[in-house]
A protein has these predicted regions:
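Conserved alpha/beta-hydrolase "acid-adjacent" motif
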Residues: 144-154
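Catalytic active-site module of serine/aspartate enzymes centered on a nucleophile-bearing elbow/loop
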Residues: 162, 166-199
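Alpha/beta-hydrolase fold nucleophile elbow
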Residues: 1-7
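Short beta-strand/loop motif that positions the catalytic acidic residue
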Residues: 137-139
Length: 199
């Protein structure tokens, strides 16, 4: 059994392998991020404060801006606030035209997201990852979610220091967040299949 988690799913996957890692044969974390405990803690306090006054289902654009607002900072002349998702313009257009994409996020979403990040990135929880579980990190070099690879490498190093025997990383030059949908997606898919063939 192989667990593959992308983006928000990769955070769920991090939590899963901390609790149930012995139930699977390998884990692939795609477009993920490593610990930023202070940031998650501040964000959680702020989101919970807003929920107290506005209610759990309130839509507060400021929370989305604080979370995702800087994601286009390395993109020259971005056309939309979502350009960080993909290098491919057709992909970005499809995203914009899809009614199920880019939906407003509730205050409760941000409360749960930040609480989850705080939990999975506690040192005592990260140490629960089985040392014999193979883990592969894959990400785009221009993906802001993992701070362009910085926090991903940090998490990989933590796993290694905790004794995880097999931790591998693949970074895709120029790609942004959606590496499974970028123009070089066949390369990404091939790398995943080659990795799985070794397990």
């Amino acid at each position: 059994t192989i667990l593959i988690g992308h983006s928000f799913g990769s955070f769920v996957s991090q939590g899963y392998i901390e609790k149930y890692g012995s139930n699977i044969d390998a884990c692939i974390l795609c477009g993920t991020a490593g610990p930023r405990i202070a940031l998650a803690s501040i964000g959680n306090c702020f989101a919970n404060l807003i929920r107290l006054f506005r209610g759990p289902n309130a839509i507060v654009p400021m929370l989305a801006k604080l979370t995702f607002g800087s994601y286009c900072k390395r993109i020259e002349n971005p056309e939309t606030e979502d350009d960080w998702l993909s290098l491919s313009k057709p992909n970005r257009m499809m995203y914009k035209m899809d009614n199920w994409c880019g939906i407003p996020l509730t205050v409760s979403f941000f409360c749960d997201l930040t609480a989850g990040l705080k939990k999975i990135h506690k040192a005592k929880n990260i140490k629960k990852v089985p040392t014999d579980l193979p883990i592969l990190f894959i990400w785009g070099a221009e993906d802001p979610v993992g701070s362009y690879g910085k926090t991903i490498r940090n998490l990989a190093d933590i796993y290694k220091k905790n004794g995880v025997k097999s931790v591998e990383m693949i970074e895709y030059p120029n790609d942004r967040h959606e590496i499974l949908n970028e123009d070089d997606k066949e390369k990404v898919e091939t790398d995943i299949l080659n990795y799985l063939a070794k397990i």
